[in-house]
Each structure stands twice: as C-alpha cells, then as structure tokens.
C-alpha cells in the first residue's frame, strides 16, 4: 500500500497531534507511530486519520511488482544469501508467502510464482522502448549514465545458454537512473506506453538484483535465477 500522500498530510496537518488522535479514535502513541509509518495500520484506522485531515482514501489495484518476491525465491533456491537482502522483514514475509502459496514447490514453480509478482514491466517507473536491443548498445548507455546497472531477460539467458520461450522476448535493463538511460537511448529508440510492444524495458534497479550477478565481456548480467524470473515475468 502506498501511503506517501497520507504521511505527507499527517506531517502538514494543522490539527494538534493530540486532537488528531482523538478525532481518529486512536491513542496518541498510535497516532505518533502511524505518522512515522502508516503502512501497517488497519485500513479503517488509516481512513479515520485521513478523514480527520479532511481527506479520504481510495483503493486501486495494480499489477504487482515487488523485488522482494524475486529475492525470496532466489534465497529459497540457493541463488541469493539472505544476509545480502537489506530489508529482512520484507524478505521473511515473502518467503512465508511463497511457502504458503505452494508448500512443496519445486525451484521452477517458485521462480514462476515470483515472476508473476515481480515482473520488470510492472515496476513503478519502468520505461518501455522500441529499438535496438543488442547488449552492446544498451550497455553503452548504461555505462555512460555512471549509475549501477545490470542486463536481464534475453541477453542474460543467452549468456547462460538458455533459449528464451519467445524469440521476441524483450531485454531488461535494470538501472538506478531509468530516465537518464532512456535519454541516452533516444537516438536509436522510441518510447511506447504499451509494455507488450516494447523490446527493451528499462526498469528501476533494486539492490537485490545486483547480488550474485557477473561481468561477462563488459556486460553486467544478473544472476541465473534472477534472469529466469525476469524472463518469465516479461513472457520470455
């Protein structure tokens, strides 16, 4: 749940914290805790806080794309060390969730489940491009950005000697600076708003994506299991 706007509203509220807590029907300590991090509050409590600030809450569903889902699957199949994941709480929750979804899942089933909820094209801030998708062109733009990056999807599968399911499987470029990299690619690419029409997906990098990766001939590539998860996520 994205509670950024509510957090900002609570911080700017002209109502005294004690009065805000009274109006919302919560203790002052609870109001203080939720002001810092409302993400774990019950929806009813969040609505009361919002109403006390003159706001209301609207819920909308979006395609899931949680990097910790992929990280959890990688930990479970031995492709990633748990201590290399920043947020242990999120990791633990996803490990438990995947086990609950399929208690006796084989590694491939785990990667498929993780792919459904961590797909690059569904990540907030992902950019869809049509143009050259050869690794050298994408790597040159990523290197020029001087930000962390790694290739996944088709080139990573190719490096592993794995044939993608679809010959049209897009290349995934994970980067800390999607907008900058896109700007460096516009001479050979054009932007599209349709993920299924793109052959290059430039997606915001999460730190777990880099763990276990390798540099092959100047190309930064994700780990084998991350490559499989990403490829399944984009349909390849």
What are these model-predicted stretches?
Residues 194-236:
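Amphipathic alpha-helical interface segments
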Residues 101-206:
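Short gly/ser-rich loop at a beta-strand->alpha-helix junction or flexible surface loop bordering the NTP-binding
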């Amino acid at each position: 749940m994205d509670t950024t706007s509510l957090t900002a509203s609570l911080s700017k509220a002209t109502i005294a914290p004690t009065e805000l807590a009274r109006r919302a029907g919560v203790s002052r300590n609870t109001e203080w805790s939720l002001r810092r991090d409302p993400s774990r509050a019950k929806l009813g409590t969040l609505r009361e806080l919002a109403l006390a600030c003159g706001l209301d809450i609207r819920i909308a569903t979006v395609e899931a794309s949680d990097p910790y889902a992929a990280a959890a699957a990688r930990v479970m199949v031995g492709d990633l060390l748990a201590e290399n994941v920043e947020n242990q709480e999120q990791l633990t929750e996803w490990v438990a969730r995947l086990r609950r979804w399929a208690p006796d899942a084989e590694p491939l089933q785990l990667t498929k489940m993780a792919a459904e909820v961590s797909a690059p094209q569904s990540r907030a801030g992902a950019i869809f491009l049509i143009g050259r998708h050869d690794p050298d062109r994408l790597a040159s733009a990523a290197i020029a950005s001087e930000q962390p990056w790694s290739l996944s999807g088709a080139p990573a599968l190719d490096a592993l000697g794995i044939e993608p399911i679809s010959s049209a499987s897009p290349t995934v470029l994970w980067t800390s600076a999607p907008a900058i990299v896109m700007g460096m690619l516009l001479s050979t690419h054009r932007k599209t708003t349709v993920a299924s029409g793109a052959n290059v997906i430039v997606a915001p990098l999460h730190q777990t994506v880099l763990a276990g990766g390798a540099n092959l001939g100047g190309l930064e590539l994700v780990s084998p299991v991350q490559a499989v998860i990403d490829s399944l996520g984009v349909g390849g």
